[in-house]
Amino acid sequence: MTMPYYASAEQIMRDRSELARKGIARGRSVVVLTFRDGVLFVAENPSTALHKVSELYDRLGFAAVGKYNEFENLRRAGIVHADMRGYSYDRRDVTGRSLANAYAQTLGTIFTEQPKPYEVEICVAEVGRVGSPKAPQLYRITYDGSIVDEQHFVVMGGTTEPIATAMRESYRADLDLEAAVGIAVNALRQGGAGEGEKRNVDVASLEVAVLDQSRPRRAFRRITGPALEQLIPAEPAPASEPAPESKPDTETKPADPQD
């Protein structure tokens, strides 16, 4: 007689968490940070048709890593949620916190009730109205529905630790757009596979957008083409290896044989 398969609830949750974390780590990294004029999104994304960064509503932006079809479903659902709330009440009632809470509830339900969790991690960003003293808001929502209110920047996907370390060392709150792009790109270059290994990050492999607080209604805009090329810092030249020092010839030649 065969025994029925049994796994504790703790083991099931642990297996689901491991599955989701591995799926997220396989993706390319995304950096979201606040700067002087709003919020900047910088994502490694060589595709020109599939976006990891997008607009949600007038003052809201969205970034995600993981399985594209899963976070694309979340993005579309977020847009519908925001449109319905803005139409039913007022456009000012659509906030980053309300969208982040809706995403957290959805991901938490999927994680606990569905056989397979979503392999995604998302960030919802918000900027205030023109002239508002309200600081930009960043909300990180993970695969299990956990939500974190981040203060300055968010790093998601890929090898996050070296990128987050580089951001902590170079981030300042008063950055302009060019400096913010430079810091984010240089941080992404630190996310190589090996220790100390740097990635080749250029314009063709980047998706960049901002939430510009100075824009009157729709704050989201993409930065592409020549405008992006002017902001990307040049790749540092590899250090040349020092030439080996020449050693003096101390060996004595054998004396000529005498006849």
Curated annotation (Swiss-Prot):
CDD domains: Ntn_hydrolase. Pfam families: Proteasome (PF00227). The keyword Transmembrane does not apply. The 20S proteasome core is composed of 14 alpha and 14 beta subunits that assemble into four stacked heptameric rings, resulting in a barrel-shaped structure. The two inner rings, each composed of seven catalytic beta subunits, are sandwiched by two outer rings, each composed of seven alpha subunits. The catalytic chamber with the active sites is on the inside of the barrel. Has a gated structure, the ends of the cylinder being occluded by the N-termini of the alpha-subunits. Is capped by the proteasome-associated ATPase, ARC. It comes from the Bacteria. GO terms for biological process: modification-dependent protein catabolic process; proteasomal protein catabolic process. Pathway: Protein degradation; proteasomal Pup-dependent pathway. Keywords: Cytoplasm, Proteasome. GO terms for molecular function: threonine-type endopeptidase activity. The gene is prcA. Component of the proteasome core, a large protease complex with broad specificity involved in protein degradation. HAMAP family: Proteasome_A_B. Its main location: cytoplasm. The keyword Cytoplasm applies. Residues 244-259 have a biased composition (Basic and acidic residues). Residues 222-259 are annotated as: Disordered. It comes from Rhodococcus jostii (strain RHA1). It is found in: Cytoplasm. One of its GO terms (cellular component) is proteasome core complex, alpha-subunit complex. Belongs to the peptidase T1A family. NCBIfam families: 20S_bact_alpha. The formation of the proteasomal ATPase ARC-20S proteasome complex, likely via the docking of the C-termini of ARC into the intersubunit pockets in the alpha-rings, may trigger opening of the gate for substrate entry. Interconversion between the open-gate and close-gate conformations leads to a dynamic regulation of the 20S proteasome proteolysis activity. This is Proteasome subunit alpha.
